């Protein structure tokens, strides 16, 4: 805790000293956004589930997907019709080296059918795992369903998009998201913010 006025042999703290101390005491939480994505699973908790088929129809789990330090898990609306998701995916392909050097494998998950994910892989030349969230079981398990859409709407089942850094044991190390789905975290900011425990 920062003390504004300190009585000591040196006398009261000066304004300059106070400003320096204030700057040093600022933590990342000071700048944290009010929006809390996936609030049921805060940083430090364990993910509830990760088991889904990839773009090749092969069943994947956290164990099969993890790099040395875990995975970067990205929940998206759709790579079929969502332009913001497509742009984010393209940016991730360009930024993938920054995460691979951190020992992280990249994993994305959407409700898109496996056939669509395979086309996305080929058309966008994606070189990492695209998972199909069958029956939106992951979106429901993580409690990140976008409730703007009713059952029967083509977009029903999409999540509030976001990113998790998950270690090989399933522990959430960091989360990144924006409240407005049209805005996505910048990949360079995400890479700079990641600290490997």
Regions found by a protein language model. Give the residues of each.
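Thiol-/selenol-based redox modules, centered on thioredoxin-like
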Residues: 154-197
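Bacterial N-terminal signal peptides
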Residues: 16-29
């Amino acid at each position: 805790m920062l003390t504004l006025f300190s009585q000591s042999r040196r006398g009261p703290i000066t304004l300059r000293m106070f400003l320096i101390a204030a700057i040093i005491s600022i933590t990342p939480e000071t700048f944290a956004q009010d929006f809390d994505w996936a609030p049921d699973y805060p940083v430090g908790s364990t993910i509830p589930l990760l088991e889904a088929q990839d773009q090749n129809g092969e069943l994947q789990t956290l164990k099969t997907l993890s790099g040395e330090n875990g995975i970067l898990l990205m929940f998206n609306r759709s790579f079929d019709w969502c332009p913001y998701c497509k742009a984010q995916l393209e940016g991730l392909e360009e930024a993938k080296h920054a995460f691979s050097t951190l020992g992280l494998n990249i994993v994305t998950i959407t409700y898109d059918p496996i056939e669509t994910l395979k086309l996305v892989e080929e058309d966008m030349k994606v070189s990492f795992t695209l998972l199909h969230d069958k029956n939106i079981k992951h979106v429901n398990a993580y409690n990140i369903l976008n409730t703007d859409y009713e059952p029967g709407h083509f977009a029903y089942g999409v999540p509030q998009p976001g990113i998790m850094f998950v270690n090989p044991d399933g522990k959430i190390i960091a989360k990144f998201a924006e409240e407005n789905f049209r805005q996505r975290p910048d990949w360079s900011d995400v890479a700079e913010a990641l600290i490997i425990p």
